[in-house]
């Protein structure tokens, strides 16, 4: 058990005048069990080291989905997006493996996107857009990707 997982306070709740046993923190399961046998365990609390961590928004979304009563199918990729990916890829004389290597994904991911089986991932779609040079999101699917905006 790591130091950050939990700490147990052993001793009296209030020490008036410094008398009585000192409250201390048990670090091992053996120390906790020994204190429980003596009846000295006051609390077992979790310690969380959250100084540099961020909450996961995906976990919040999954909790919301879990609490809903109706069953919702995950969104699938539109069929014309898959056809556009396949068409542009063949125009550029790239195989699925070449495209997958270019965007650092597995060839099965490209296959799923082209077949329309994939659950849309904005990061993967963005990488495909840049690699193929066409839009795959929004209303203008299949149109050439514009360069950076002029200032």
From Swiss-Prot:
Residue ranges annotated for the HTH cro/C1-type domain, each copy included: 85-139
UniProt-annotated stretches for the region Disordered: 1-31
GO terms (BP aspect): GCN2-mediated signaling; maintenance of translational fidelity; rescue of stalled ribosome
A molecular function (GO) term: ribosome binding
Residue ranges the UniProt entry marks as DNA-binding: 96-115
The keyword Zinc is assigned to this record: no
A cellular-component GO term for this protein: extracellular region
Domain of life from the UniProt record: Eukaryota
Role played: Transcriptional coactivator that stimulates GCN4-dependent transcriptional activity by bridging the DNA-binding region of GCN4 and TBP (SPT15), thereby recruiting TBP to GCN4-bound promoters. Involved in induction of the ribosome quality control (RQC) pathway; a pathway that degrades nascent peptide chains during problematic translation. Required to prevent stalled ribosomes from frameshifting.
Family: Belongs to the MBF1 family.
Entry protein name: Multiprotein-bridging factor 1
Organism of derivation: Candida glabrata (strain ATCC 2001 / BCRC 20586 / JCM 3761 / NBRC 0622 / NRRL Y-65 / CBS 138) (Yeast)
Lineage of producing organism: Eukaryota, Fungi, Dikarya, Ascomycota, Saccharomycotina
